[in-house]
Design a protein with these regions (language model features):
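Short, solvent-exposed loop/turn segments at secondary-structure boundaries
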Residues: 38-41, 99, 160-164, 223-226
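Predominantly flavin-linked oxidoreductase catalytic cores and closely associated redox partners
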Residues: 55-185, 193-202, 211
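FAD-binding beta-loop-beta segment adjacent to the flavin cofactor pocket
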Residues: 16, 132-135, 190-212, 262, ...
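Conserved mid-domain beta->alpha element of the FAD-binding
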Residues: 197-269
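N-terminal Rossmann-like dinucleotide/flavin-binding domain of flavoprotein oxidoreductases
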Residues: 22, 29, 40-60
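N-terminal FAD cofactor-binding segment of flavoenzymes
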Residues: 1-32, 47, 107, 111
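C-terminal helical "tail/cap" subdomain of flavin- and related membrane-associated enzymes
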Residues: 239-341
Length: 341
């Protein structure tokens, strides 16, 4: 997570749980490499689990599948039921025909290497790798002198994840870089939505009266698919709710989600350009052009705070994709329905 993604108090709230914070990061493309001075933090699932377990103590229920979640309680697969005035559904993305999506798919291996890797900063986007049938890059996170997370990320039209194929690719890249893997410490994988358009009101209506957060509630960055920064905002919204009841919190979250959707329209245009305006092997050129822009603009992009001037700066100049194809991508989808609740 980049430091400017969250407000100052939001960053301060989660900073104790970061495994590491770096003073900057790098990117690599066929035409150049660049180092940026934006602070970057690594928050692991283990750290989040530890914080949650410490806060909930004996009230934490683990290893149980939730079959039903309603505004007044939840029912588990083992037959247990819980009643509560406030139920929050954070079970991740759910399939919905209301939204049209591309997908950010990734598999990462945290490895202990036989020798130090030599990286001092994260490389959040290494697009010098083979592109093939989609926009693809590697994400490299140096967690220690000989500990390295190597993640293969692909922006794909289909959500299916070829776990074995991704893993083989990661090991091949490690070999090319001269990194001999002594041990795989853990694996992570995911498929995140990259929204191209749709009827957000219909998406919200599918949730019923249960407050939904994270990807399930539509709270994620429209281009990266990441949800941590918006999770901080929604947590603050819930914590300050005048009445902690499911229906009241659901209304407040819907209002926030609709406001976010309306503010994210420009990102959905860019997403359509990425997925529809260039041949798959050429899509990296869009990001290659983007990362030449000033660092403050890049920070505002990931923080969801683009100004009108920023949007103009992103679009002006010689486009990295054919002009007619870009126009078709912008205009080629059906008119987006207005969000409603």
């Amino acid at each position: 997570m980049f430091r400017p993604d969250a407000a100052k108090d939001g960053w301060s709230a989660i900073e104790p749980y970061f495994e590491r914070i770096w003073s900057g990061y790098t990117v690599a493309f066929p035409e150049y490499r660049r180092r940026l001075g934006t602070e970057y933090g690594c928050l692991t699932g283990a750290a989040l689990y530890g914080a949650t377990a410490a806060a909930l103590g004996a009230n934490l229920v683990e290893g149980a599948e939730v079959l039903e979640a309603g505004p007044d309680g939840a029912r588990l697969a083992d037959g247990r039921s819980f009643l509560a005035p406030l139920v929050i559904d954070g079970r991740g993305w759910r399939h919905s025909t209301a939204l049209r999506c591309g997908w950010q798919k990734f598999v990462g291996l945290e490895c202990r290497l036989e020798q130090p890797h030599g990286l001092d900063l994260p490389m959040v986007m290494d697009a010098e790798v083979e592109q093939a049938d989609c926009f693809r890059f590697l994400y490299l996170l140096p967690l220690g002198p000989d500990r390295l997370l190597i993640e293969d990320t692909r922006y794909s039209a289909e959500p299916e994840l070829d776990l074995r194929g991704f893993t083989v690719s990661i090991r091949r890249h490690a070999g090319v870089r001269g990194w001999r893997i002594a041990e795989v410490l853990r694996r992570e994988e995911g498929v995140l939505p990259v929204v191209l358009g749709g009827d957000f009101g219909a998406f919200l209506a599918e949730q019923g009266s249960v407050p939904a957060v994270g990807a399930r509630g539509g709270f994620f960055h429209p281009t990266s698919g990441y949800s941590l920064a918006r999770a901080i905002d929604t947590a603050a919204l819930i914590a300050t709710a005048p009445r902690p009841a499911s229906r009241d919190v659901a209304t407040a979250l819907r209002q926030r989600a609709i406001a976010d959707w309306r503010g994210d329209g420009f990102y959905r245009v860019l997403n359509r350009m990425l997925f529809q305006a260039a041949a798959p092997a050429e899509r990296y050129r869009i990001l290659q052009r983007f990362y030449r822009l000033p660092q403050p603009l890049i920070e505002r992009f990931y923080g969801g705070r683009l100004t009108l001037a920023d949007k103009a700066r992103i679009l002006l100049g010689r486009p990295p994709v054919p002009i007619l194809a870009a126009l078709r991508a912008v205009r080629g989808l059906p008119q987006e329905a207005s969000a409603h609740a």
